Amino acid sequence: MEPMESCSVPPGFRFHPTDEELVGYYLRKKIASQKIDLDVIRDIDLYRIEPWDLQEQCRIGYEEQNEWYFFSHKDKKYPTGTRTNRATMAGFWKATGRDKAVYDKTKLIGMRKTLVFYKGRAPNGKKSDWIMHEYRLESDENAPPQEEGWVVCRAFKKRATGQAKNTETWSSSYFYDEVAPNGVNSVMDPIDYISKQQHNIFGKGLMCKQELEGMVDGINYIQSNQFIQLPQLQSPSLPLMKRPSSSMSITSMDNNYNYKLPLADEESFESFIRGEDRRKKKKQVMMTGNWRELDKFVASQLMSQEDNGTSSFAGHHIVNEDKNNNDVEMDSSMFLSEREEENRFVSEFLSTNSDYDIGICVFDN
């Protein structure tokens, strides 16, 4: 059988029909012996030709092909049997998975069977890279498959393992995966494969370059804005402060800016720190005293219960309430004195530094 003349189609012509077109147009017209507008699919005796010879026999035009299409007539393996003969001189075609229905919109028009070519003889054949889709007309999905009659076939080579999933490097628009244990069809349409793998791609957190750059910019922005200036707050006890005119309130985490205060400001600031230390020490002493009073109170309660009973417990309770009231009054007086001292310090500091702007900063640890 001579190969088809390459001049039968114009240059640049590429034949890539869908499943619906193969079954609904080409195969239907072939079975009905009707004329096909562009006769580019050859009749091939699939069981007398090896798959690697299809490239020359089913060549269309001058363009490089990754898929080869042909019509084939199925014959029974035995005259009285029901199995189809799928053997060649070098090997045999073995069906894998389940047949897939082909629909024209919502109407069932055919079925697609997937086969893999094995070199040698069953059951010791060696699996090759050649895959074939065999299409047949069918109106009932549950009907037994036809073992005789015309079918249209698409043959292609299996995509190599580890090959980049690029449309330009795919050996075919259909590719083959290993047979699953549950018997699901191992040859998948690229669209089905992409939709199946979409959730895995995003579940792994893969991002494009623009998304990664956006994340880096966001991190850099956060790092360079650790200290954010707040708006001025109005207080009845403090005068309004001027908004800083310099970059005193903005500090970068990567660059340490040291602002040198004048001598008078330094002394005032140091006195303020010393005052804060004194107040902390006073609070520690007060808390220590309170804990001591609590210890005394618990001890007295235990002693009174053992010696005098519930009557002495009431007396101790009254005495301790008086002590607690005295402590509250002492704490209130100390708090008021500390507040007056702070107000006085701020007033002195503002009066001596009227020419300078002060900013309020929030330091995030």
From Swiss-Prot:
* Tissue expression notes: Expressed in root metaxylem pole and in shoot pre-procambium and procambium. Present in root developing xylems. Specifically expressed in vessels but not in interfascicular fibers in stems.
Q: What induces it?
A: Induced by chitin (e.g. chitooctaose). Accumulates in plants exposed to callus induction medium (CIM).
This chain's function reads:
Transcription activator that binds to the secondary wall NAC binding element (SNBE), 5'-(T/A)NN(C/T)(T/C/G)TNNNNNNNA(A/C)GN(A/C/T)(A/T)-3', in the promoter of target genes. Involved in xylem formation by promoting the expression of secondary wall-associated transcription factors and of genes involved in secondary wall biosynthesis and programmed cell death, genes driven by the secondary wall NAC binding element (SNBE). Triggers thickening of secondary walls.
Q: How does it assemble?
A: Interacts with NAC030/VND7.
In the record's own words, the domains note is: The NAC domain includes a DNA binding domain and a dimerization domain.
| DNA-binding residues | 109-164
Q: Which InterPro entries match?
A: NAC-dom, NAC_dom_sf
Alphabetical list of PROSITE patterns matching this protein? NAC
MF terms from GO for this chain are: DNA-binding transcription factor activity; sequence-specific DNA binding; transcription cis-regulatory region binding
Spell out the protein name for this chain. Answer: NAC domain-containing protein 37
**NAC domain boundaries:** 9-158
Q: Which BP terms does GO give this entry? A: callus formation; cell wall organization; positive regulation of secondary cell wall biogenesis; regulation of DNA-templated transcription; xylem vessel member cell differentiation
Q: Which GO terms describe its cellular component?
A: nucleus
Q: Family, per the entry?
A: Belongs to the plant vascular related NAC-domain protein family.
> Where is this chain's protein located in or outside the cell?
Nucleus
**Species this protein is from:** Arabidopsis thaliana (Mouse-ear cress)
Superkingdom as given in the UniProt entry: Eukaryota
Keywords in alphabetical order: Activator, Cell wall biogenesis/degradation, Developmental protein, DNA-binding, Nucleus, Transcription, Transcription regulation
